[in-house]
Curated annotation (Swiss-Prot):
Extracellular topological domain residue ranges: 40-59, 131-151
Name assigned to this protein: CASP-like protein 2C1
InterPro entries reported in the protein's UniProt record: CASP/CASPL, CASP_dom
PANTHER family per record: CASP-LIKE PROTEIN 2C1-RELATED, CASP-LIKE PROTEIN 4A4
tRNA-binding among keywords: no
Species of provenance: Oryza sativa subsp. japonica
Length: 194
């Protein structure tokens, strides 16, 4: 029986390390996206007028920078929780285990949805900046502010990878949550005589 307990403890430690690595990767990707888009500026001269492109010129990019920074902070806090559980918890039972699992599950889902939604909204705004909209007489901007648009594209890639990683983390937190509930299936009858 003790070998089973040791194997279960080793499996929990491996799961915590894997979750920690995934959370660390998501935190780095979200922080990279926030920094790439948030600190991005470019100044160009157009018809003898100096114009500066910043993240605040496009509301969707500003929202992406704030959401990515918040997601990076959230993943960092969850990474600290994973570190604590893998180092100090040692399988001790917790009275509030289900409540904490529900909270992590809901926060992971919310983070995944917000990260994905803000990334897609920023990508839509970037498509307008890339191609323009002739019906509204909006001109292309990426042929003027090339470096700015390239950095925004890099931040969109990082943010989308962070959103996919966050979706995977929400699957992990769902597994951790529903593992705390007993199975509703009845055990198979043990009438087999052998």
């Amino acid at each position: 029986m003790s070998s089973y307990m040791e194997a279960a403890a080793a499996a929990r430690a491996a799961e915590a390390k894997t979750e920690g690595l995934l959370r660390g990767a998501c935190a780095l990707l979200a922080a990279a996206a926030a920094l790439l888009v948030g600190l991005n500026t470019q100044t160009e001269t157009v018809l003898f007028i100096r114009k500066k492109a910043t993240v605040k010129d496009v509301q969707a990019l500003w929202v992406l920078a704030m959401a990515a920074a918040a997601a990076a902070g959230y993943h960092l806090l969850q990474l600290l929780r994973c570190f604590y559980l893998s180092r100090f918890a040692d399988g001790k039972p917790c009275r509030h285990r289900r409540a904490i699992a529900w909270l992590c599950f809901l926060l992971d889902k919310g983070c995944a949805y917000i990260t994905f939604a803000t990334t897609v909204a920023a990508a839509q705004a970037c498509v307008v900046a890339l191609y323009g909209t002739h019906a509204l007489q909006w001109t292309k901007l990426c042929n003027i502010y090339t470096r700015f648009c390239e950095q925004v594209a890099g931040s969109l890639v990082c943010a989308m990878l962070a959103a996919v990683g966050t979706a995977l983390l929400s699957v992990v937190s769902a597994r951790n949550l529903f593992r705390l509930y007993p199975s509703m299936l009845s055990p198979p009858p043990s009438s087999f005589v052998g």
